[in-house]
Amino acid sequence: IFVYSSIMDNNAIDNKFFFAIFHSISAFCNAGFSILSAGLYDEAIRFDYFLQWIIMTLIVLGGLGHNIVFNFYQKIKTHVVELFDKTIIHKKVRIITLNTQIVIYTTLVLLIGGFIFLFISEYNNTLLEHNSIFGKITAASFNSVTPRTAGFNAVDFTKMNVPSLLFIIFLMWIGGSPASTAGGIKTSTFALATLNIFAVASGKSRIQLFGRRISSESTSRAFAILCISLITIGISIVAMLIFEPKGTPLLTVAFECFSAYSTVGLSLNYTPTVTEPSKYVLIACMFIGRIGMLNLMVGLLRRLNHQFYEYPKENILIN
């Protein structure tokens, strides 16, 4: 309804009802598909800032995950019941889970940090076509949201500065949240890896956050996912550089591989020109990124028998 109302007076769009349904589903599912040839950068809707904020909201909600949204629903429902039914005595229950808190805080940091960085980096570049300050804020915000991992383009990414492209690669790599429609290594994985670094630097043997202790199994899994993703993407980049003509920019190839692994769909307009072997590399990268290399390895290598013994423990020198 909101998407339809934003384009109701736009004569350049023919089937407005279908446009609204298609883009709403595409945004919430983090698909990034558009029926317009230039996507949301099309001249017909390039400066429709109301539409862009609606699309951003749908992308974020889809990228948070159904369990996070349901957790907030439980919280709101409890507050409403307590507000209108004073006769019921409720015990203080921890409704918002630790997973929800980690996902929300990490998402906010990435969104706000991404907006500030891209607003400063692109202010005198791709944001110049937006005359108003509100337009520049909207464009910078959209560029911070869409790499994780919707894939809509509201600017020409080929004209972006190198620092901006590197930061977008970073956002694409992280992606959305667990049990969501987004790809990437996930916000909780990045958060746990970051928290573990600070815990090790502080001399702590465990991660404690918001009055809860995070299991070592979760931390190990997070680092495994992080390392496997970088190895997979690195192999994909090397493979593409072998198959592509000499002189192909490394940044362009890296951008395509990170986008493929996280199933983002953003491109520097290079994908249509890649060689046949490189297309298979990108296909494999997308498949592994969507399924998860760790999940594939667990499915192939995990044994059914359980070990009921332990070997002696010994420390290894690191750094």
Where are these regions (language model features)?
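Membrane-proximal intracellular helices of multi-pass ion channels
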Residues: 1-319
